[in-house]
Structures are given as C-alpha cells and as structure tokens.
Amino acid sequence: MRLIIVSGRSGSGKSTALDVLEDSGFYCIDNLPAGLLPQLAENALINTELLQPKVAVSIDARNLPSHLMRFPELLEEARARHIQCDVLYLDADEEVLLKRFSETRRRHPLTNANRSLAEAIRVESDLLGPIADLADLKIDTTNLNLYQLRDSIKLRLLNQPEPGTAFLVESFGFKRGMPVDADLVFDVRCLPNPYWKPELREHSGLDQPVIDYLAAQPDVEDMYNDISSYLLKWLPRFAASNRAYVTIAIGCTGGHHRSVYITERLGQQLQQTLKNVQVRHRDL
C-alpha cells in the first residue's frame, strides 16, 4: 500500500495536489485529523475492500495544535505498519500567498477578528513546522501556475518506474528566484552567455545552434565535467542514505540557455548510472 500525505500553507496548492492524485487512482481524504493517521493506515491494510491500495490525505493547520506537534510520532506509527508513506509539503512566498487570497477572496482558515491575513499565514507556518521538517518532497509553488504544478506533482511523485531515490535535475533563471526546494544548487552564470549573440538570443539550450556554441567553449566543458564528477560521486551516497527525493538545480541568468544546456547533458549522463532521474526546465 502507498500513502501520500499532502500538507502546506493555505493557498500553496494542496487542493490541486489532491485532484491530481485522485485523477491518478488514489483514494483521497481532505483535512484528515492527524491523530487518525495510524488508524487510517491500519484500516486500509485490514479492509482492502473499502480503501484502495493507493491513498492520499491532506493534513492542514485546522488540526489541533497538539496533534500537529505529534506528527513525527504519528507518521512513525503509520510507517511501522510497513506502508510506503510519502510526505509532500507545498509552500510559496508569503507575498504570493497574500496575493492569491486577495485575488480569490477566500478566507484563510486561521484569520479572525484579532488576526490579520499576514499574521494567520505566519502562525500557520509555525503550526505546520513538524510536518515541513519531515517532508520527503517539498515543492515551491511561487512561480508555478496550475498546469505547471500538476505536471510537477506527476513528474516527482507518480512517474517513478522503480523504487528508490527520485532525482530531479532542474534548470532555472536567477532573475525569477532560486528554487527553494533544491538540495544542490550550481551557479553557471560565469559561463559565456549565448544571449549576447543576436543569432542565438531567441533560441534555447535545447536548440542545436546554442548547443554547438556552448559545446565549443572550454569553460563550459570544464564546468560541466566538474559538476558531473561531483554528482556521479555523491548522488549514490544520497540514495544510500534513504533519501526519497533529491533536486539538483542548475541556474543561469534567465534560465533559457546555459542552465538548460548543462541540465540536459547532466540528465542524460545521470540516467545512464542512476534510476529515477527526471529533467525539468522551470523557466522555459
């Protein structure tokens, strides 16, 4: 049986995550009281007619604070029943969360006459801290639209052909911010930039003219070889430490040329030696 626990601050995309999982065959339960997590796991194992072998639940800040504080203990009880449990934590910048609530005119569950929306968001962050600390996978939805979030969840949680650590090699542009869910970040902004070549500007690192240009630059080759050597040596150690997810982020200025080229090459090489390697270009 597989159990996915979805959590995160309000407005970060939990409902979308549950919709994706339900569309993928999961039996979904919204706003499960955290204290019922071990009981749910036990019932799912005993009564397979009632529940599917794939279950997803959301746990949010409407739970009793005492139950949220006990989340590490409750999760351990569920895992002790030999259930594959993945904790997905969604989040976004506070400014973006404020904007989303303003646009949708929804009420935050923790606001009241004495607590503003901004204060409610900060309180919620503290309440969900025990869950965030144990997340197997964190997804920052700050720069993701609805469709990108759906694709990201499918890529990271559902498209794993084999068990083991799931690796994501992701390109990004620093001008749109670093991905906060990255485990390893490599900055390639020091490399020659195709953007300043008028004939290359409108192309991306996926296009042959840019590939040919960057492949001919000695510094690009040196940078690629150094990053590749580091990852080939150390990523197996991450896998051996039972990490469920590892994200490697490669950043350049705009996320269109250098980072895309390096990410594509790294992804292709890592796929030859590691299982479950995915490639994503955040800003293309």
UniProtKB/Swiss-Prot annotation:
Keyword tags: ATP-binding, GTP-binding, Nucleotide-binding
Keyword GTP-binding in record: yes
Gene Ontology MF annotations: ATP binding; GTP binding
InterPro entries per record: P-loop_NTPase (IPR027417), RapZ-like (IPR005337), RapZ-like_N (IPR053930), RapZ_C (IPR053931)
Signal peptide range in chain numbering: none
Sites where the protein binds ATP: 8-15
Residues binding GTP: 60-63
Keyword Nucleotide-binding: yes
Record-linked SUPFAM superfamilies: P-loop containing nucleoside triphosphate hydrolases
Family to which this protein belongs: Belongs to the RapZ-like family.
Reported function: Displays ATPase and GTPase activities.
PANTHER family associated with the record: RNASE ADAPTER PROTEIN RAPZ (PTHR30448:SF0)
Name of the protein described by the UniProt record: Nucleotide-binding protein Pput_0988
Source species of the chain: Pseudomonas putida (strain ATCC 700007 / DSM 6899 / JCM 31910 / BCRC 17059 / LMG 24140 / F1)
